[in-house]
């Protein structure tokens, strides 16, 4: 890059970061069923098809095009997150069932958590069209405290991922944040909260969680 003039040494420095290999369940480099080299196009298609089957079984009133669009987007997130959530220099096992699961430390789980927030915000806006953003009140429960503290660790997680050339640090952070969110939601029914100030605080809190998750997946490239 220096020799071709693409990079100016005085303005930018390059650093080599080694990456491990994606292996099959047998611990050997991942291959197709016929033993050939696994092409990215084939991998993307396989994961997208796996996600599609799951979406189809719970698709409700979604059209074929909508289900396929969701499968493609979530499938790409599954692969990128699955790859980046591992330590860069280590080999890892590609398990399509684990990578495409909507539970656990996976891309689909992160996407699901974001969709859950958007659904709550949409319902809240429909029920309270004139509502304004509230002040985030001091937390009163452990789950609320855990979520607030997790949000406070965002800058630290980004800095660690950058300085250590380790995107897995950011992946682990958003997984922890998503867990805190879902545990908080399981304990606090936002739509049925009778205290308007608390309800506004909860909505502002999860809106901030969504913003952090969206920023994080943008930084991770999906």
Predicted regions and their residues:
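Non-catalytic interaction-recognition regions
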Residues: 1-222
């Amino acid at each position: 890059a220096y020799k071709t003039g693409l990079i100016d040494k005085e303005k930018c420095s390059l650093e080599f970061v080694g990456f491990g290999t994606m292996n099959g369940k047998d611990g050997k480099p991942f291959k197709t069923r016929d033993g050939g080299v696994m092409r990215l196009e084939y991998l993307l298609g396989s994961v997208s098809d796996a996600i599609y089957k799951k979406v189809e079984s719970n698709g409700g009133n979604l059209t074929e095009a909508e289900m396929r669009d969701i499968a493609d987007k979530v499938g790409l997130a599954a692969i990128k997150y699955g790859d980046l959530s591992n330590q860069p220099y280590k080999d890892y096992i590609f398990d399509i069932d684990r990578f495409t699961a909507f539970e656990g430390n996976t891309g689909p789980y992160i996407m699901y958590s974001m969709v859950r927030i958007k659904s709550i915000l949409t319902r809240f806006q429909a029920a309270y069209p004139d509502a304004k953003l509230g002040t985030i009140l001091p937390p009163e429960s452990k789950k609320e405290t855990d979520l607030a503290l997790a949000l406070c660790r965002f800058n630290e997680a980004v800095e660690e991922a950058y300085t250590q050339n380790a995107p897995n640090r950011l992946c682990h952070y958003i997984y922890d944040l998503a867990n805190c969110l879902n545990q908080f939601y399981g304990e606090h029914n936002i739509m049925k909260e009778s205290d308007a100030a608390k309800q506004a605080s909860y909505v502002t809190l999860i809106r901030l969680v969504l913003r952090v998750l969206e920023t994080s997946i943008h930084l991770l490239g999906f």
